[in-house]
Amino acid sequence: MDKIIIEGGQTRLEGEVVIEGAKNAVLPLLAASILPSKGKTILRNVPILSDVFTMNNVVRGLDIRVDFNEAANEITVDASGHILDEAPYEYVSQMRASIVVLGPILARNGHAKVSMPGGCTIGSRPINLHLKGLEAMGATITQKGGDITAQADRLQGAMIYMDFPSVGATQNLMMAATLADGVTTIENAAREPEIVDLAQFLNKMGARIRGAGTETLTITGVTHLRGVEHDVVQDRIEAGTFMVAAAMTSGNVLIRDAVWEHNRPLISKLMEMGVSVTEEEYGIRVQANTPKLKPVTVKTLPHPGFPTDMQAQFTALMAVVNGESTMVETVFENRFQHLEEMRRMGLQSEILRETAMIHGGRQLQGAPVMSTDLRASAALILTGIVAQGVTIVNNLVHLDRGYYQFHEKLAKLGATISRSSEV
C-alpha cells in the first residue's frame, strides 16, 4: 500500500502551482456524454484521476466507445448507435458519483439499471432525491437486491421541488429532463459552478436549460442531442486546498488558473483570518504570516456557502492558528474523522454532533496517520507539513481519487515530501 512521507516543521511554501480540471465537473460531463445519439463528444482539460478512469469504465460498460488521451488530458466519447441500459456493477460500486448515469441512460433508452453506488464513507448520502425526481417525471422505480431499476417509455416534464439542493440529484434530473416531453422545473436546485458547467455543456449539445447557477432550473425537453467539444472548468477544491496550504505555512503561492468567483466563500474566510488573497492576471496569490492569523467560525453550506469539501483542509489551518476556532458541518454527518487522526499529532479538539472546536496554535508532532476519505487525505498531508518531525500518511486510495500528483506539486513549492510503495 502506498504512503506519503513528510518531514515537517519549518517549511514555507513558495512558488506557483497549476490547477487541474475539476473532478466534480468531469464526472457528470462523462455521464452527460451518454445522451447524444449523434456525433462524438470531446472533453478537454480532463484530470488524470482514478475516479475518471472508473467513470470511463462505467460508460464503456454501456457499449459506448471511450478513448482517454492522457498526454493531452482529453477524452473522446462516441455514444452514437445502440447503447446498453445496465451500468456495470464492478465499477458503479467503486464510486458514489456513478449514480448520475441513471438519468441519462433512462432518458436515452427508456430503461435503466444501476447498482447502489460506492465511494467515500461520509455519512449516509441518500439518493432518494434522485429517485423522487425521476418518479415525478413519470419513471417507475424499483429497488431490489442492491439494484435500482427505472422504466419510462418517455419521461414527462414536471415541477420538482428538492428538499435539499443536492448536487448529484440536480445533475441527474437536469440531464434526464433534456430529453423529456415538455418543460421540467427544478426548485431549490444546487447552484455550484459544476452545475453551471454541466448546463453549458448540455446547451452546446442542443439542450434548452435556463437558470443554471440559481435556485430554479427550467429545462425544455428536446428530441435528440449531438456530441460537442468542451473544456472542463478548473477544480475549485484543489485550488482551495493550495490556498490553505499557503496560509498554513506563512507561504507565498500563486494558484494558477484558479477562479475567484468559484472560491469566494473560502477567500472571505481566509481574509477574515488575516490572510492576504489577491487576484492576479494568471490566478490567485495567497500570502500569510501564520503566527498572526486570527481564529474564526465557519459553517459549511451548499453553494454559495462555504464548501463541505474544504472543511477538512480548513480545520487543518485552524489547528495552526492561535486561539479557538469553530467548524460547523451542516452538509454531511460523520465528516470529522480526520480530527481523530490529527489528535495523534497533538491536536486538541472537541466534537459535539455537527460542531468541532479546534484549540489551535500548539506545536503539532509528526505521526503515522490513516486517511479516511478524499479531503481528509489532503488535510492530513498539509498537517504533516507543519508538524515537527516525520508524518506518514497511509491509505492513499482516497487521495488518488481527487488530486493529481499532489505530493509532487507540494514538493515543487518547497515541502519535504515523497511517496513510497514500500511495505
UniProtKB/Swiss-Prot annotation:
It catalyses: phosphoenolpyruvate + UDP-N-acetyl-alpha-D-glucosamine = UDP-N-acetyl-3-O-(1-carboxyvinyl)-alpha-D-glucosamine + phosphate. GO terms for molecular function: UDP-N-acetylglucosamine 1-carboxyvinyltransferase activity. UDP-N-acetyl-alpha-D-glucosamine binds at R96, D309, V331. The keyword Signal does not apply. InterPro entries: Enolpyruvate_Tfrase_dom, Enolpyruvate_Tfrase_sf, MurA_subfamily, RNA3'P_cycl/enolpyr_Trfase_a/b, UDP_GlcNAc_COvinyl_MurA. Phosphoenolpyruvate binds at K23, N24. It comes from the Bacteria. Pathway: Cell wall biogenesis; peptidoglycan biosynthesis. Pfam families: EPSP_synthase. The modification 2-(S-cysteinyl)pyruvic acid O-phosphothioketal is found at C120. Its main location: cytoplasm. It is found in: Cytoplasm. Keywords: Cell cycle, Cell division, Cell shape, Cell wall biogenesis/degradation, Cytoplasm, Peptidoglycan synthesis, Pyruvate, Transferase. GO terms for cellular component: cytoplasm. The active site is at C120. Its EC number is 2.5.1.7. One of its GO terms (biological process) is cell wall organization. Belongs to the EPSP synthase family. MurA subfamily. Cell wall formation. Adds enolpyruvyl to UDP-N-acetylglucosamine. This is UDP-N-acetylglucosamine 1-carboxyvinyltransferase 1. The lineage of its organism: Bacteria, Bacillati, Bacillota, Bacilli, Lactobacillales. The gene is murA1.
